[in-house]
C-alpha cells in the first residue's frame, strides 16, 4: 500500500468525483479575509470540513449508552455555525464533503492538531473500499470546559492508501450499513 499525494487526490476528485465539493488547494482564510481552521488538499491528504448539522449528546433522557440499542433521544439536533460541546461530552456531525472511495483504496482519518491541542478529539473510522457518503464525525471534549467546533472549517485530515491488489469483497459488495449515508448517522446494528 502506498500513501497518495496531492496530485493523485486532485486527479481522482476532478476526474472521478471522489470528493464533492472539492477544494484543490489549502484554504486558510474565509471570503471576508479572517483566518479559519484550514481545509482542502494538503501534501498527502485532504482536510475535511464539518457541516452546520450537529447532534449534541445529552444525558437527560438516558441512563446508559448502549451501541446495540442506541436511543436517538440521547441527542439534541443543532443547526448552527458553531457547536458548543459541554465538558467531558461529545457531539456528532457530518462532513461538507461527499466521498466515493475507489475499490483499491482505504482511508485513515486523523484529527487536526488545532483541535487536538485544545483537548477536542475527532474520531472517524476508515473509509473502506467502495464506501460512499457523507462522513459522520465524532467530537469528544476531553476538557472540564465547554469546547467550540466551527462549521464549514477544517476538522480532520483524510489520508488515502492505494493497495497493490484489489480486494475480493468491498464495503459496497457486503452491503455495508453506512453505505450512501446522508446527514448525521447514528449507530446501526
Swiss-Prot record:
Q: Which reaction does it catalyse?
A: dCTP + H2O + H(+) = dUTP + NH4(+)
Which organism was this protein described from? Nitrosospira multiformis (strain ATCC 25196 / NCIMB 11849 / C 71)
Q: Which UniProt keywords apply?
A: Hydrolase, Nucleotide metabolism, Nucleotide-binding
Identify the metabolic or biological route this protein is part of. Answer: Pyrimidine metabolism; dUMP biosynthesis; dUMP from dCTP (dUTP route): step 1/2
Kindly give the Pfam families that the UniProt entry links to this protein.
DCD
Q: Which InterPro entries match?
A: dCTP_deaminase (IPR011962), dUTPase-like_sf (IPR036157), dUTPase_trimeric (IPR033704)
Membership in a protein family = Belongs to the dCTP deaminase family.
Gene Ontology terms for molecular function: dCTP deaminase activity; nucleotide binding
Cysteines paired by S-S bonds: none
A GO BP term, please?
dUTP biosynthetic process
Amino-acid positions noted as binding dCTP in the UniProt annotation, renumbered to this chain = 112-117, 136-138, 157, 171, 181
Whom does it interact with, and what assembly results? Homotrimer.
The catalytic residues are 138
Please tell me which top-level EC class this enzyme sits in: hydrolase
Extract the HAMAP family matched here: dCTP_deaminase
Q: What EC numbers are recorded for this enzyme?
A: 3.5.4.13
Function, as annotated, reads: Catalyzes the deamination of dCTP to dUTP.
Q: What is this protein called?
A: dCTP deaminase
Amino acid at each position: 500500500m502506498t500513501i497518495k499525494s496531492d496530485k493523485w487526490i486532485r486527479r481522482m476528485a476532478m476526474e472521478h468525483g471522489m470528493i464533492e465539493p472539492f477544494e484543490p488547494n489549502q484554504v486558510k482564510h474565509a471570503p471576508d479575509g479572517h483566518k479559519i481552521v484550514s481545509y482542502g488538499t494538503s501534501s498527502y491528504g485532504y482536510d475535511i470540513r464539518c457541516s452546520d448539522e450537529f447532534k449534541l449528546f445529552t444525558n437527560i433522557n438516558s441512563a446508559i449508552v448502549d451501541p446495540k440499542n442506541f436511543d436517538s433521544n440521547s441527542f439534541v439536533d443543532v443547526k448552527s455555525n458553531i457547536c458548543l460541546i459541554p465538558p467531558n461530552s461529545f457531539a456528532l456531525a457530518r462532513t461538507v464533503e461527499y466521498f466515493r472511495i475507489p475499490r483499491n483504496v482505504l482511508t485513515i482519518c486523523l484529527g487536526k492538531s488545532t483541535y487536538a491541542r485544545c483537548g477536542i478529539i475527532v474520531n472517524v473510522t476508515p473509509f473502506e473500499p467502495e464506501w460512499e457518503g457523507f462522513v459522520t464525525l465524532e467530537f469528544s471534549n476531553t476538557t472540564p470546559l465547554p469546547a467550540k467546533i466551527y462549521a464549514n472549517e477544517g476538522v480532520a485530515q483524510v489520508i488515502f492508501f492505494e493497495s497493490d491488489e484489489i480486494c475480493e469483497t468491498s464495503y459496497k459488495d457486503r452491503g455495508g450499513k453506512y453505505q450512501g449515508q446522508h446527514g448525521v448517522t447514528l449507530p446501526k446494528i
